[in-house]
Design a protein with these regions (language model features):
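Structural alpha-helical scaffold elements that stabilize or flank donor/cofactor-binding regions
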Residues: 66-67, 86
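Structured adenosyl-cofactor binding patch, chiefly the S-adenosyl-L-methionine
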Residues: 87-132
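SF2 helicase motor core recognition
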Residues: 81-87
Length: 167
């Protein structure tokens, strides 16, 4: 998960969702001239399409969003929506259907609705979205080093010993 800190600090609450925040890898962008552009450019450089949620721009329905490549979903704030930097750099704009008088969902609701819609499509269209075995192993190693005391040192020692064995 990538967070862009402009006006507010983002901090995972330790006790929410029974500690699920420990298993989310956070990339923080909050310093520099343009943290938003830094984040978007980094994502694009590793093959991600930028998908911005908005009720105003030209948009496609979530059901029409191409699912053939990695995507980064961008959600704006309830007050201001997405920034002009996101508008200028997004590959797609999607609109979350809303009914009634307001044009805004709480951010957690917007994320949940969007992810559920995409997940349903992936399953219904039999699109594989699982991590590869190699990606799973790398992630498990990363998690293990987080929960074991001196996990980084232990990982380095294991890697050193494995390298010695292969010589």
């Amino acid at each position: 998960m990538r967070t862009i800190k402009k006006n507010n600090e983002y901090k995972i609450q330790r006790y929410i969702s029974r500690g699920a925040g420990r298993w989310v890898h956070l990339y923080d962008y909050g310093s520099g001239i343009s943290p938003t552009l830094e984040c978007l450019n980094e994502l694009k450089s590793i093959g991600y399409k930028i998908v911005a949620t908005t009720p105003h721009e030209k948009y496609i329905k979530l059901s029409e969003l191409p699912l053939d490549c990695p995507m980064a979903l961008v959600f704006g704030t309830e007050m201001d929506g997405i920034s002009s930097e996101v508008i200028d750099n997004a590959d797609y704009f999607v609109k979350i259907p809303m009914y009634g008088f307001t044009e805004s969902y709480n951010i957690s609701v917007a994320v949940a609705l969007t992810l559920q819609s995409i997940r349903n499509r992936l399953e219904n269209e039999n699109i594989s979205f699982d991590l590869s075995k190699e990606e799973q192993i790398k992630l498990k190693i990363k998690w293990a080093t987080k929960i074991i005391r001196d996990g980084d040192k232990i990982e380095q020692e294991i890697r050193r010993r494995l390298m010695e064995k292969t010589k």
